[in-house]
Amino acid sequence: MSRIRFVQLNHLRPSQQRGAAAVEFALVLIPLLALAFGIVEFGRTIYHYDAVVKSVRAASRLIAAYDPSDSVSFSSAATQARCIAVFGKTSCQSGDTPLAPGLATSHVKICTRASVAECPDLQIADVQNVSTGTGTGTVQLVVVRIDGYQFGFLGLPFTGVGTSVQFNTISSVMRGI
């Protein structure tokens, strides 16, 4: 009967195994860094999306305080609302930094029943407030939205992965005066 012989797999001396852990660490570090960068970039995207949503809400809150039938004051308020939506303040200067990179006042659309040209896909009507019986009459709705905004990623240059994502339409509807 033959005897079974066990072969020792770890036949290298410790002095010959130096650096093996460093090589393994380097091989694992590359995907871990890419994963960490992706997580940070995803968080950055969510942060900018939230900033844009809040600025649109603030712009609609401002424009809702003006009567759309008064074209002079409403036009001035619309300009201020566009500045709030993009820059976070009521006045725009040429050197101002937008809240999100690439955001411009041309992305902001302000729509009311009287001015539907900027939002042809919306049907805005005054809402008759008859259910309460208080006699408050009609309620004017104001819509502020951002269309076509593309958020640019920092990106990993060697991957060739997409460098931007287009956000869906971000809108806020408020009850006007």
Tell where the protein language model's regions lie, with residue ranges.
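Alpha-helical assembly-interface signal, strongest on the long, hydrophobic N-terminal helix that forms
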Residues: 2-86
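Short, conserved structural patches
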Residues: 2-7, 57-177
